[in-house]
Amino acid sequence: LFMDLPAWASHEKRFSRSNIVYIVSDELGYYELSCMGHPHFQTPHIDRLAAEGIRFTQALAGSSLCAPTRCCLMTGKHSGHTSVRTNGGGTPLRAEEATIASVLKQVGYATGGFGKWGCGGRGSTGVPELHGFDIFFGYYDQVHAHSYYPPYLIRNSEEVPLPGNHGLSDGTTYSHYLIVEEAKKFIRKNKDRPFFCYLPVTPPHGIHDIPESDPAWALYKDKPWPLDARKYAAMVNMVDRHVGEIRDLLRELGLQEKTIIFFSGDNGGAEYFRDAAHPRGFHGPNVNPLTGVEFRGGKGNLYEGGLRIPMIVCWPGKIKPGRVSDLLWYFPDVMPTIAELAGATPPSDIDGISIVPELLGEDVVGRKQAQHEYLYWELSGQIAVRKGKWKAIRPGMGKAWELYDLANDVSETKDLSAEHPDILKELMALAEKSHEPAVEGEFSQPELNEKDRRAKFGDAVPPEKINVTLVQNMPKVGLIPQKNYRIVSCSSEAKTKDRLAKYAIDGDPRTWWHTEFSPEVRKHPHELVIDLGGEHTIRGVRYLARQDSAWNGTIKDCDLTTSTTPDFPEEPTVKLQFSKTREAQERLFPEVRGRYVRLRIYSEVNGGPWASIAEIGFVGE
């Protein structure tokens, strides 16, 4: 359902429909621009964009991780209403969901996306070409984007080979260059009609790679910094150069005054390259370089460091230059804003509000800028609510709520929950009414998305032909044969992600069991019961953690109970602890006789609520 066309949409008659370019720089921190006074970065083109437009001091991400925040940006919904709320990779939009692109397409816009999508892997209902994009070129799954030298990129769900590339940092064709060139081709092709060019580029997100021939590397290669810190800064400068190239192209085509450009990060800064001298990261993305005032936290949590992003908007002749705005807004507001600029009508079920009055002027638009009653975020058990100067946050599942006065404590250092229980109660009530269970899209061909995730490592071939040296294998010597095992029960499994319990005993390290995390997160303790196929002497257990790029669910504390029948005694046979490693781990104990084994899991290596197992086997005969 779409809202009736509001009266203010008639401004289209006064302003011809604009072209819209939205550039997202992945993981770029709020302070990581030279216009913010940062001495490590040189970003003259982005600085000029700010000088000729408006820079926002309180623009906030939709979430603090890649996929969830992009879903908020695309759909106009906050993370209590979105379909993509986890960052495991590939989680899809539902088939019927509207995006910025689909809204603009209805009013005649050409729509192109170039970079990292994150709202649905190949073979799912969330692919961009099903959500309004005429073309999308780049990465669909964010794990695929963890290499700048993948063997292929994706164009409208079809693979585009990249010659000479072998994954990770090994290759000759730098993906980011191709992505920017495709965006330029799109702009040239559509110069005579209104277009929406969405450019969610991957740099400076890791793996931190930049060709030695890139002019940005020459600026940083001799700095007395850690290598990856130099590469990161060079990647930021490279993105800046490409922002300049996009603007140069618009000038060349006579489109500069017909095009509004948005530039932002996607979530709060990641505090990379920490050491004793740089406890908030070598570049301090969440530390004011001029005053030392800090935003607490960073990417992955809901403190200000995880949500505050750079946001600049420029439209020559329409937006007054050199403005700095303190308007409080966030990613769900982007869709209604762009829809209004295009003379389009956004869906009626969005959470965002248009900020066009703030951009163009209330006198020009003919109405005052609307304000949010409150803003809402949720992420893997974390919850945050912002109302005016007050922010309530629950930093994790089962943790106490905290309350901060951001007007006087932007660093979130003084918890005022005890002093202002009524305010906290009000914000907690807003949080409760803001959450709806997530309803994700579906996969018809999950194997395509899995292939793209493996392509990070250079795997462009079917699973049966994978070079197994890319992952650790669990040694089979001394194990009771896995082929006889059977899953009796499990506490939960992530069925929507095809992370089933049976994969813990299938002998393939590339698949794994993961406990349910969507639509609801299942918390510890987790349990797996396995039938060994007959009575055996059991003297140990062998465990292999998941072999992809994440650690979610990797087991730490657990106990193991054996029995000759499906009924288990109260006392466990042995208590165990595993480490954070990709290599197989073995834990031996005094031998017992049994057919059934119950593994009960109490904690995860990173403190999360999940459990996952790539392979598990039992030592004995």
Question: How would you describe each model-predicted region?
Answer:
Residues 569-590:
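Extracellular carbohydrate recognition and processing domains
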Residues 600-607:
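Short beta-strand-plus-loop segments that form exposed binding edges in beta-rich domains
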Residues 457, 466-535, 546-553, 557, ...:
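Disordered, acidic Ser/Thr/Pro-rich linker "stalks" and the adjacent N-terminal cap
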Residues 264, 314, 491, 544-546, ...:
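Predominantly extracellular/luminal cell-surface or secreted proteins
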Residues 196, 540, 596-598:
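Short, conserved beta-strand segments of beta-strand-rich sandwich/propeller modules, principally
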Residues 316, 406, 613-621:
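Short beta-strand-to-coil "C-cap" segments at the C-terminal boundary of structured domains/repeats
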Residues 540-574:
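Extracellular ligand-binding interfaces
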Residues 1-402, 406-429, 433-437, 441-448, ...:
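Formylglycine-dependent sulfatase
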